[in-house]
Regions:
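Bacterial Sec-dependent N-terminal signal peptides
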Residues: 1-30
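Conserved small/polar residues in nucleotide/adenosyl-binding loops
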Residues: 247-253
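Conserved, well-structured interaction surfaces
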Residues: 46-50, 54-60, 84-161, 177-192, ...
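Acidic, serine/threonine/proline-rich low-complexity intrinsically disordered regions
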Residues: 170, 184, 237-246
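Amphipathic alpha-helical protein-interaction segments enriched in hydrophobic
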Residues: 215-225, 229
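Membrane-proximal, proline-rich intrinsically disordered regions
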Residues: 21-71
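Short coil/turn linking the two alpha-helices of tandem helical-hairpin repeats
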Residues: 158-159, 165, 232-241
């Protein structure tokens, strides 16, 4: 009798397992995310926004060149000197760098522009998220987070490259012909644009976020980034619009600094 009960229980268990396997295998795949449906849900909309943060340039990494992971940016100037003569930063110091040499890290130029493109796309589409999924208050927060990030990406490039290309609000087709012939915006145009964008973004950002959202943009972050940008721009040594002459700073012969 006991053997019969055990056998019956074993068949029930096996049947349940087979049924569960069949139901799992019969599941329809989740709807793939596309440009048409990604903004239909709050979850996927937030995921898109969160991904824009990943385009933050890795300026904490010390390397200034692509084939070196231990040389800081200062090695590309006269602010410091290193004994590694086989590193590509010497091509800058020896004036042998040319456009065909891929020296600088990609994430100091290519990556910010990718982030700017993603921020533009998000800002143009976040309003498509239905109100039952995302209320107007949070929608405004999301929009201004992307606006802050876009301005921040510009602000991070300016200390490295000086004035850059301002894309504006529309996504740009980077494969179009003639784009490489476009002149850069002026320093003042870049600073004024970024400062205004940070100011406007600050108006629509919260003072703080719950702890689970630690690290997301806030009003204070936007205003702090704006203040730092304007502080640096006020220095003649930084913005370069008015070249400073040091010809009057001479030293006696054989003097050491």
């Amino acid at each position: 009798m006991k053997n019969t009960i055990k056998t019956f229980a074993l068949f029930l268990t096996a049947g349940a397992m087979l049924a569960s396997c069949d139901s799992y295998l019969d599941r329809q795949p989740d709807e793939p995310l596309t440009s048409d449906n990604i903004f239909k849900k709050q979850k996927t909309t937030l995921q898109y926004l969160t991904n824009i943060y990943s385009y933050q340039p890795d300026y904490e990494a010390p390397a200034c060149v692509s084939n070196s992971n231990d040389i800081p940016w200062e090695a590309c100037s006269d602010e410091t000197s290193f004994a590694y003569l086989d590193r590509s930063y010497t091509q800058i110091n020896y004036n042998s760098w040319n456009p065909s040499l891929h020296i600088y890290r990609d994430d100091t130029y290519n990556t910010p522009y990718k982030g700017i493109r993603e921020a533009n796309y998000f800002m143009q589409n976040v309003h498509k998220c239905p109100p039952e999924e995302l209320n107007d208050v949070d929608k405004g927060y999301y929009y201004n987070e992307a606006r802050f990030l876009r301005a921040h990406f510009y602000a991070m490039m300016l200390p490295v490259y000086g004035p850059v290309f301002l894309i504006g609000d529309d996504p740009v087709d980077f494969t179009q012909s003639g784009l490489d012939q476009r002149e850069r915006n002026t320093w003042d145009e870049c600073v004024n644009y970024v400062a205004n964008e940070l100011w406007e973004a600050a108006k629509g950002l919260p003072d703080s976020w719950p702890d689970i959202y630690y690290g997301r943009a806030t009003k204070g972050a936007a205003l702090a980034a704006r203040a730092r940008l304007l502080l640096y721009s006020a220095r003649k040594l930084f913005n370069g619009n008015e070249p400073v002459s040091y010809t009057h700073l001479t030293l006696p012969t054989n003097s050491r600094v």
